[in-house]
Amino acid sequence: MELHNDEKRLLKAFQESNEKIMNLEELSKYIEKEKVMRAAFWLSGRDFLEIIENKTKICELTELGNQSLDLGIPERKVANYIKENNLESIPIKDLSKILEKDETGAALGNLKKKGLVAIDKGNIVFKDLDYVDIEEEVLKKASEDFNLSNYSEDEVKIIENLKKRGFLKINEVVDRSFELKNAGIDFIKKPIEIKEEITQLTREMIVSGKWNDYFIRPYDAKIPTEELYPAKAHPMSKIIQEVNEVLISMGFKEVKSQIVQTEFWNFDTLFEPQDHPARDMQDTFFVKYPNTGTVPKDLLEKVKGIHECGTIGDEKISKGWCYNFDENVSERTVLRTHTTVSSIKYLASLSECERENAQKVFCIDRVFRNEAIDYKHLPEFYQCEGIVMAEDVNFDNLVGILKEFLQKLGFEKVRIRPAYFPFTEPSLEAEVYMEGKGWLELLGAGIFRPEVLEPFGIKKPVLAWGIGLSRLAMLRLGLTDIRELHKNDMQWLKKTVISEE
């Protein structure tokens, strides 16, 4: 094992001084101070020595603190003013004549807190103008003795208060010493030879042959290095990006919609009855302003007919829901509860010519549910939803698309189970298998019912599916509480890696 020259110089310092423990100042007599820590870090990784850190808190007066040593803290300024002007008291409103604007409130508060004054009809009356202020005494001591370990527990509390008031600041100083371990002791028992070394060859060295005179230092990939945590995207953002890239690779294009939607687009167009529990205030965020929105009248009439009796004009689609549809309810605004509204609005925007072509779109965005926050529910979360519209697609195609999508996200084992959703028929749930957890439900899907598509003049089958990305993130990151995704835990954010599966 060949050591770096700086490592050798550091060990030679121990050899020549015949010491087992040395500090930074002592070692800097043998090797440049800026190189000591680097060499010591390398040697500690080789188990040659141990770096011992002794942390000390020291206090340092600020500019305000130094001024207060000469002029007094604000409370003392008030006392001195009264004393110098032979006054018995001073009106509170006159404090601004003595103190800076930002000192006035704090000075009055501290005078009362310390029990130095009484307030009589808006006047400040000192009980003793020659009082002793422990804060002033500690401030003076801090100007001479910086080491907090020399202060009593009560004095440290006063130091903390002086820090809050801006008179001083507290810094942490780290003193390091270096102790040889057995491997290092064994190494310095032998002569230490330091050769001139180089880390790279130049053309001149090669042409002249001088490279033979140097020792070329080999690279050691096993030497421990300091961990670096460069800026990176949040794990949730990485998962959103990954899902986006997977869907684009599968031939989908992304669409968007507004966060605030009318109930018409969010519920009515999906054949969800107006008395459905999902529309209750405990499940949906209703917008206070604007509390209504514009609804296209021609589509409203068609959707209304579908809801009431399952007809569009003279064409019978189904039985409908058999209730009186309220157009005023359709105009109410809500925070969207799903991203399916993006696909529905996209389908509604298609021209007659565009409806003849196959369509594959998806949306990844935030949705909102008025739910109590717990380990698996948040009022705001990301959802991904997609549709495929084509002449010859069927349930088997839907299953194939979902399996391909989930496998591209790293889930090899996928199974399909029957399910119910109000706007698709047939419907399914896709489950994925994870070691140690078993089968877990991940997404819902189905084929849009005719009641959803007919108002837009769409006759082709439309496959639809949706997945909660927070749920996906929990599975990928091994989390048991959805709230952990949004905590400001810097260590977790630094060290979390999204596996490239």
Curated annotation (Swiss-Prot):
Name of encoding gene: pheS
Family: Belongs to the class-II aminoacyl-tRNA synthetase family. Phe-tRNA synthetase alpha subunit type 2 subfamily.
Protein name: Phenylalanine--tRNA ligase alpha subunit
Complex formation: Tetramer of two alpha and two beta subunits.
Binding positions for Mg(2+) per the UniProt entry: E425
Keywords linked to the UniProt accession: Aminoacyl-tRNA synthetase, ATP-binding, Cytoplasm, Ligase, Magnesium, Metal-binding, Nucleotide-binding, Protein biosynthesis
The enzyme's E.C. designation: 6.1.1.20
Organism: Methanococcus maripaludis (strain C5 / ATCC BAA-1333)
Ligand binding (L-phenylalanine): T340, F423, F448
GO CC terms, sorted: cytoplasm
Main EC class the enzyme belongs to: ligase
Gene Ontology terms describing biological process: phenylalanyl-tRNA aminoacylation
Cofactor requirement: Mg(2+)
Record-level Gene Ontology MF annotations: ATP binding; magnesium ion binding; phenylalanine-tRNA ligase activity; tRNA binding
Domain of life (superkingdom): Archaea
